[in-house]
Amino acid sequence: MCPSSFRLILSVILIAFLFVGLCEAHRHINVDIINDIGPNVQLGLHCKSKGKDLGPQSLAPHQHWGFTASLNVWETTLFFCHFVWENQSRWFDILKEKRDTIVCKYHPCVWSIRPSGPCRLTDHEKCYPCNADI
């Protein structure tokens, strides 16, 4: 392979990586979680992804807490949260990129955590069951 062809191929690959990196830098979703378990009930939660632990949080009734998640190029970004209150313990995939991107692309993904399960309030209310215990 001649040196000029090698430089051209290398330049195209470098530009492609830079372009993907710049596009990825602007892809994110904001998640907002609301404690709607009930009056006088504190909600404990701990959210994580494969590579990021957001730490334990505690929310008073109707209090909000949120985070911003960067989305990956494979559309597989996943954050899950463990919720505890009184004698209950549940977990849920609070951010699944393929499920939430269209609805939460321009507005925060707002989740109301209720005894019956989490409900996404963004766009129109949609409730989901919690994940099964393992």
Swiss-Prot record:
Swiss-Prot/TrEMBL keywords: Glycoprotein, Secreted, Self-incompatibility, Signal
Chief localisation class: secreted
Segment forming the signal sequence: 1-25
Q: Where in the cell is it found?
A: Secreted
Superkingdom field: Eukaryota
| GO biological process per UniProt | rejection of self pollen
One of its Pfam families is Self-incomp_S1
According to the record, glycans are attached at 87
A Gene Ontology CC term for this entry? Answer: extracellular region
Among InterPro entries, the record links this protein to: Self-incomp_S1
The UniProt similarity line reads: Belongs to the plant self-incompatibility (S1) protein family.
Protein name per UniProt = S-protein homolog 18
